[in-house]
């Protein structure tokens, strides 16, 4: 069991994460809100068998909704962990250069987003749509053959800020 934190709101999720969200607001722009619509859920994992959650998998990939002033440009930064921890035991996490996707259309489509294969390790710059932007994140957990069982946690920090453009 793990936890996401979104603007002082904690949400539960399986095998995973603590999400801290930072928001910077330009004076002329409406404040962003960040909502966690779905948690990144690895579910059961087995020793020595990596498990991948694709960003397009509804119900298991993390889904975030960012709203704010339509047309304003924002920067999105993830601070991603490389391990989850449980009482001194670690389990490797991998976030690939294609593990993020976004869609700012009126009806965001996780299976066919308008901005796909995004690198979550680098700053993402994007203009908010009328409905904001929906962001999806997948990843891989890599348990060792002798991995201790139990609930592992890690922290993901998502920072969204207006760029002024």
Say what each PLM segment does:
Residues 29-91, 127-165:
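N-terminal small/polar-rich segments of proteins
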Residues 5, 125-127:
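Serine/threonine-rich, low-complexity intrinsically disordered segments
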Residues 8-10, 96:
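Compositionally biased, low-complexity segments
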């Amino acid at each position: 069991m793990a936890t996401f934190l979104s603007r002082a709101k904690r949400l539960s999720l399986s095998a995973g994460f603590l999400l801290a969200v930072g928001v910077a607001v330009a004076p002329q722009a409406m404040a962003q809100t960040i909502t966690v619509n779905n948690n990144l859920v690895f579910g059961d994992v087995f020793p020595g068998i990596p498990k991948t959650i694709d960003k397009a998998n509804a119900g298991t990939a993390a889904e975030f909704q960012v709203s704010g002033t339509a047309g304003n440009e924002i920067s999105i930064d993830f601070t991603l962990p490389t391990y989850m921890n449980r009482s001194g035991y670690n389990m490797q996490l991998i976030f690939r250069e294609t593990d993020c996707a976004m869609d700012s259309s009126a009806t965001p489509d996780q299976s066919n987003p308008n901005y796909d294969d995004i690198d979550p390790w680098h700053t993402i710059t994007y203009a908010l749509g009328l409905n904001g932007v929906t962001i999806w994140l997948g990843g891989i957990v890599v348990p060792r053959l002798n991995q201790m069982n139990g609930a592992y946690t890690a922290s993901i920090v998502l920072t969204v800020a207006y760029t002024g453009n």
